[in-house]
């Protein structure tokens, strides 16, 4: 009888440990997602400045006598602007979608997520990494263009 009680107690402790681990997992992933967002959000200003700079450079080249080299630079600058604008849009779209999927308590206070929302959060974690890569990549490309 004592063995059964001890076994039952161990099973309960094990289940409780699994339960608390699951509770920690979602807030941890939520924090990771928000950390990526918080890291790239300040770069939105950089994107705006680079769009303006590349457009200014492109406009000055459009006033010059056309050559093959100038045409290539104009195309590259246009590509850079397009890349920056797409990255910016990706961030805005991600924020809108993310905010529509989760409540403020879930995002800011770590409120427990149901299975469906955990699945959505896993998808959002992938999307936020893609968005981060698009932002960083477009900024790096634009900075290279602006220094030529």
Predicted features and spans:
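Immediate post-signal-peptide N-terminus of mature secreted/exported proteins
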Residues: 19-65
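Long, amphipathic, charge-rich alpha-helical segments that form helical bundles/coiled-coils
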Residues: 73-124
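Alpha-helical rod/repeat scaffolding segments in eukaryotic adaptors/tethers
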Residues: 23-33, 63, 67-77, 111-121
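Positively charged n-region of N-terminal signal peptides that target proteins for export
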Residues: 1-4
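C-terminal amphipathic alpha-helix
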Residues: 36, 40-44, 51, 110-148
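C-terminal motif of bacterial Sec signal peptides marking the signal peptidase cleavage site
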Residues: 14-17
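Secondary-structure edge/capping motif, primarily at the C-terminal ends of alpha-helices
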Residues: 51-69, 98, 102-109, 142, ...
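Subset-of-secretome marker
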Residues: 27-28, 83, 93, 134-137, ...
């Amino acid at each position: 009888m004592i063995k059964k009680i001890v076994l039952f107690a161990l099973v309960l402790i094990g289940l409780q440990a699994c339960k608390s681990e699951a509770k920690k997992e979602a807030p941890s992933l939520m924090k990771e997602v928000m950390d990526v967002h918080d890291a790239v959000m300040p770069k939105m200003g950089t994107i705006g400045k680079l769009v303006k700079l590349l457009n200014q450079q492109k406009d000055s080249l459009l006033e010059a006598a056309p050559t093959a080299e100038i045409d290539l630079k104009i195309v590259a600058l246009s590509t850079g602007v397009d890349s920056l604008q797409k990255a910016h849009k990706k961030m805005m779209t991600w924020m809108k979608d993310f905010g529509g999927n989760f409540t403020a308590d879930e995002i800011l206070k770590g409120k427990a997520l149901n299975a469906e929302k955990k699945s959505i959060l896993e998808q959002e974690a992938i999307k936020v990494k893609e968005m981060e890569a698009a932002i960083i990549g477009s900024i790096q490309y634009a900075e290279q263009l602006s220094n030529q």
